Amino acid sequence: MKLRNKLIELNIDVPDPIAPVGNYVPYKIINGFIYISGQVPVVGSITSGNIITGRVPSEVSVSEAKEAAKICIINTMSLLIEATDNTDYDKIGCISVSGFVNSGKADTSFKLW
């Protein structure tokens, strides 16, 4: 099953990749490995202003932060679909995923998972 179709089956709507703003490529393929640049929680385009920003939990609720993380992963999946030409999802492996949360100083009072 194609990756996009699997995500649709899981009720995950994956938009087209967001156009980069700046001098970088959104992904690069080296020796069969896909390196995807960091994604931000934006819906639509970065210039549209539909981006979630702020520190958790002082400026952004934990619930909003979870939604932001979900948006970042969906944006990553969009690039993965493009980079793999929407290949079958069982042919794709993952080596590493990193995520970053903007929180207050040493704030460990919340969990995003």
Q: What is the predicted function of each stretch?
A:
Residues 1-113:
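Short, polar/acidic, helix-capping and beta-turn segments at strand->helix junctions
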